[in-house]
A protein has these predicted regions:
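Conserved, well-ordered alpha-helix/loop/beta-strand core segments that scaffold catalytic motifs
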Residues: 2, 85-126, 270
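Carboxylate/His-rich catalytic cores and anion/metal-binding grooves
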Residues: 52-80, 124-152, 267
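Small/polar-residue-rich segments within soluble enzyme cores
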Residues: 1-101, 434
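Short, gly/Ser/Thr-rich active-site loops of penicillin-recognizing serine hydrolases
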Residues: 355-364, 451-480
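Soluble periplasmic/extracytoplasmic beta-strand elements of cell-envelope proteins
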Residues: 14-16, 30-34, 105, 126-130, ...
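Short, charged, low-complexity patches
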Residues: 57, 328, 442-447, 451-455
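Short beta-strands and strand-coil junctions in structured, solvent-facing domains, enriched
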Residues: 21, 114, 126, 440-441
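Beta-lactam-recognizing serine transpeptidase/beta-lactamase-like catalytic domain environment
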Residues: 80-85, 90-93, 133-184, 189-442, ...
């Protein structure tokens, strides 16, 4: 080129060809990720890279960088003093051809992914859907999102600055990195643990005083609830999401042990077996373990003077407990499977490789016996079809959806809307978690979104067009 022939006049400059990515669809942005120039440390320490090379920064681009990048080729050329091409050195004897990277096949159902992204427009939160029988991630949505092509080309730095300074954090992958209180969805786990440890049976009843719900201590402290019939059994407690029931069950569970420390250690072990409090060893390089405090945390905080009622908020998924949406979806898949799961993963096939990582094909069991899941699941079904169900508006004709609403307290504004579900009840095809920040009741936003996603995936159509229109028109992002 003309410029190349003149470069000898500009010391330190050279021409270099780069292969640029193009993302033909704006869908699955947080999943796919994006490329960026390698940093100085990587360029110096990794012999594959040189300054100016591109590598994966986030998503699949980063997690499967080695599979995608291929092998570099090399061509040695002769040039004259004016940098003009004089042909190959020794007829290309030392040249090598580049080898293309592997082709990856993802687990994503692209139509479901696109639909979920439409439903989450003008909202902040996440959706994660998993196939329980395989652990394959069917959709993983973080909202708001962004156009990945903004991070390609000359204006990449300028666009990145704008995106990174956006108060709604579109670059932040809430599905993997957002840590939230699970709210009442976590009552299911506490119910399972209480059953396993004989703190309660399916016929154990607890009274609820309505507004004051569960009262405890000499000062008359309480965990509030809402007016409903009382007393309640386990299944009814799930159906109407009674705080008092699960606080009582939590206290009964603790009473089975000789000390608070012993009880909490046992509880912590059970909860951990659901993939909570750890990274789950999936095929993403980014993600957070959430927050599941150990006994030592409370021993230090309360100087050894604490009991079940001190941490009673954990009974209803509040307090120090924080989960990521992918953990909530995996928790739901475990319930759907009656006690086991496959590590959630996003890649199902890599060209040139016969099998995927065995970590993704090996069953992992939680610590709860299979027989204790049925009463929990029966209660979850009543959430959508029962007279007092908290998500009656999300039932679908001829399809048993087992779900649980959650409304998590938010110190920064409106409560968060949560819903976890799987369907159908027997031989489940999909497990899903929906989290809508500042969405209020779980039944208002999260449950309808989950129902629409389930309908789309299983029935391939939408039976409730009015509900769909309500969600599509909903705008929960406040404009300044």
């Amino acid at each position: 080129s003309t410029l190349g022939e003149s470069l000898y006049e500009f010391h330190g400059f050279y021409l270099r060809k780069l292969t640029m990515r193009e993302y033909p669809t704006n869908s699955a942005t947080h999943l796919v990720g994006y490329l960026g120039e390698v940093n100085r440390t990587k360029a110096k320490t990794n012999p594959f890279y040189t300054k100016g090379d591109l590598n994966g920064v986030s998503g699949i681009e980063a997690a499967y960088e080695e599979e995608l990048r291929g092998e570099k080729g090399m061509a040695i050329k002769l040039v004259d003093v004016h940098n003009r091409d004089q042909g190959k050195f020794q007829d290309g004897k030392f040249d090598t051809l580049p080898i293309a990277g592997n082709t990856l096949k993802s687990t994503i159902d692209i139509e479901l992914q696109k639909y979920g992204e439409k439903l989450m427009q003008n909202k902040i939160g996440a959706i994660v859907a998993i196939e329980p029988s395989t652990g394959e991630i069917l959709s993983l949505i973080s909202a708001p999102t962004y156009n990945p092509n903004l991070l390609i080309g000359r204006k990449r730095s300028e666009n990145y600055k704008v995106l990174s300074e956006d108060e709604n954090k579109p670059l932040f992958n809430r599905a993997l990195q957002g840590t939230y209180p699970p709210g009442s969805t976590f009552k299911l786990i506490n119910g399972l643990i209480a059953l396993q440890e004989k703190g309660i049976t399916i016929n154990t009843n607890f009274n609820c005083t309505g507004d004051k719900g569960y009262t405890f201590g000499i000062k008359g402290r309480f965990v509030g609830c809402h007016p409903h019939t009382t007393p309640l059994s386990l299944k009814k407690g799930i159906e109407i999401s009674c705080n008092a029931y699960f606080c009582g069950a939590y206290d009964k569970y603790f009473s089975k042990f000789n000390s608070t420390v012993e009880a909490y250690d046992n509880w912590h072990s059970h909860v951990s077996s659901f993939g909570i409090g750890n990274y789950m060893n999936n095929d993403f390089i980014s993600g957070f373990p959430g927050k599941l405090p150990k006994t030592s945390y409370f021993e230090k905080l309360y100087r050894g003077s604490w009991n079940a009622n001190t941490v009673i908020s954990m009974a209803i998924g509040q307090g120090e407990l924080l989960l990521t949406p992918i953990q909530m979806a995996n928790m739901t898949a475990i319930i759907a499977n009656r006690g086991f799961y496959y590590t959630p993963h996003i890649i199902k096939e890599i060209s040139g490789q016969e099998n995927i990582d065995t970590n993704f094909t090996k069953k992992k069991y939680c610590s709860i016996e299979a027989k204790y899941f049925e009463p929990i699941i029966d209660g979850m079904l009543k959430v959508t079809i029962g007279e007092g169900g908290t998500a009656q508006n999300s039932q679908i004709a001829n399809l048993d959806i087992c779900g649980k609403t959650g409304t998590a307290q938010n110190p920064h504004g409106e409560d968060h809307s949560i819903f976890i579900a799987f369907a159908p009840k027997d031989n489940p095809k999909i497990a899903i978690a929906v989290y809508v920040e500042k969405g209020g009741w779980g039944s208002t936003w999260a449950a309808p979104i989950a129902s629409l996603m389930i309908d789309k995936y299983i029935n391939k159509n939408i039976s409730n067009s009015h509900q769909e229109r309500f969600i599509l028109d909903g705008n929960l992002i406040t404009e300044d």
